[in-house]
């Protein structure tokens, strides 16, 4: 009885028709490929309940100067500090303005004022989009820096669990986010309500924001038609992404302090948390593709599942898209709301070392990688923090991989398959189904 090898390359191919994925994996969930071997992802266990039934939309982990470990997590109405012993402390500033748990889209009828325009004449496209409230979190030394896109104020928390986070003195308000540069400047993004403005504090002093001959504070309005979405540290630079393009900020010293250069067009960010930095550069999701920046110019990242992802995403809830790294497996995960959901219930994963993709379903709203803590910590839709890559318990989720069609020979021979010899790392029972 002859054996016919089915050499299926790692990763999922989900572009085009089923037939175009011949000889490839067509669908999967909770499956990864590592060094050519297919296996389930690691399991997860509950770590802490951060906020009952409130979605975390921003998180960070860090160690303070005494080597104590912390996490911070923000919802649309609260900001929390989480100790290494999983004690959750509400550090919400007293002046914080509650935001929006979900995005809202108002278009067409009711989007304008009664009596505007003349009957039968064309109108401009009327779309009012309110984003879901998300948090931009970073550290200033051992202290937490936080800003929500709805509230717009910049806060600092100095590790005192008996005190709330406080507004940073003299910092601009009505901001869209923050990032702390490698040179220790605090950038306010969309500063003062100007969606294209970057304003920075003096070096090592986040309370000095007015430029003077004796400091390095400053500001600049980006030459772009878009609005700033996020800032993220890149190697030797700070990358600023708008919803249309990308700009790199490079420290130059006085008198200009920072120089800004557009490094990519038509590569805007889909959301304020869609970018992740790894050794190979910064990767992010756009509205119809994926991009990377490792110095020089932005590069497109070819994606073998882009048709599936972007035809399946909820455009109205795109502001909830977020990226999480899993460095142990050289992965970047993007969680997104599917077209049938208001919450992040699906994901797409890129293995940036082996250059392949995976897809699946899993509801997570934010997360931090391992490093500060032993395991990645990802947050579920009910406000629970989970230790991931821990054991083999995948709850009630279904783990599977489905291939595209196979042709034996030229497809002109009828064969009867009586046995399949798998080559994969198995955790428990595995069932196989043939489709004809």
Where do the language-model regions lie?
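Beta-sheet repeat architectures centered on beta-propellers
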Residues: 1-96, 105-142, 265-281, 287-436
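Asp-box/WD-like beta-propeller blade repeats and closely related beta-sheet repeat scaffolds
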Residues: 130, 158-181
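Beta-strand initiation motifs
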Residues: 87-90, 161-166, 207-214, 254-260, ...
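Hydrophobic or amphipathic alpha-helical targeting/insertion segments
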Residues: 139-167
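Carboxylate/His-rich catalytic cores and anion/metal-binding grooves
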Residues: 173-208
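Structural signal for beta-propeller blades
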Residues: 79-80, 152-154, 195, 246-247, ...
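Surface-exposed extracellular loop regions of Gram-negative outer-membrane beta-barrel proteins
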Residues: 238-264
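Short beta-strand motif characteristic of blades in beta-propeller domains
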Residues: 72-73, 146-147, 186-189, 237-242, ...
């Amino acid at each position: 009885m002859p054996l016919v090898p089915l050499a299926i390359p790692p990763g999922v191919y989900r572009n085009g028709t089923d037939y175009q994925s011949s000889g490839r994996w067509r669908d999967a969930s909770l499956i990864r490929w590592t060094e050519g071997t297919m296996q389930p992802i690691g399991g997860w266990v509950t770590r802490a309940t951060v906020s009952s039934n409130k979605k975390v939309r921003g998180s960070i982990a860090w160690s303070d100067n005494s080597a104590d470990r912390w996490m911070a997590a923000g919802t649309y109405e609260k900001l929390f500090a989480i100790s290494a012993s999983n004690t959750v402390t509400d550090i919400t500033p007293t002046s914080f303005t509650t935001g929006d748990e979900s995005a809202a889209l108002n278009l067409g009828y009711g989007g304008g004022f009664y009596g505007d325009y003349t009957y039968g004449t064309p109108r401009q496209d009327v779309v009012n989009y309110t984003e879901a409230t998300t948090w931009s979190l970073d550290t200033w030394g051992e202290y937490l820096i936080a800003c929500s896109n709805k509230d717009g104020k910049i806060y600092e928390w100095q590790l005192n669990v008996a005190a709330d986070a406080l507004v940073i003195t003299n910092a601009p308000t009505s901001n869209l986010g923050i990032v702390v540069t490698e040179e220790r400047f605090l950038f306010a993004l969309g500063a003062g309500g100007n969606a294209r403005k970057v304003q920075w504090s003096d070096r090592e002093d986040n309370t000095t924001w007015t430029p003077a001959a004796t400091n390095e504070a400053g500001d600049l309005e980006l030459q772009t038609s878009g609005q700033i979405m996020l800032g993220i540290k890149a190697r030797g630079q700070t990358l600023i992404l708008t919803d249309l393009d990308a700009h790199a900020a490079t420290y130059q010293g006085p008198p200009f302090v920072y120089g800004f250069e557009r490094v990519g067009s038509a590569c805007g960010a889909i959301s304020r948390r869609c970018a992740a930095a790894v050794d190979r550069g910064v990767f992010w999701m756009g509205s119809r593709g994926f991009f990377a920046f490792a110095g020089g110019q932005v590069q497109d990242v070819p994606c073998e599942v882009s048709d599936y992802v972007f035809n399946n995403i909820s455009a109205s809830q795109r502001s909830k898209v977020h990226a999480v790294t899993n460095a142990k497996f050289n992965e970047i995960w993007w969680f997104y709301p599917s077209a049938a959901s208001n919450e992040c219930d699906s994901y797409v994963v890129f293995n940036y070392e082996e250059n392949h993709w995976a897809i699946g379903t899993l509801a997570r709203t934010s997360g931090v990688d391992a490093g500060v803590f032993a395991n990645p910590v990802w947050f579920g839709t009910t406000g629970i923090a989970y230790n991931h890559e821990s054991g083999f318990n995948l709850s009630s989720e279904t783990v599977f991989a489905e291939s595209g069609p196979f042709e034996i020979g030229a497809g002109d021979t009828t064969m009867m398959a009586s046995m399949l010899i798998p080559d994969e790392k198995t955790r428990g029972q595995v069932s196989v189904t043939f489709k004809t």
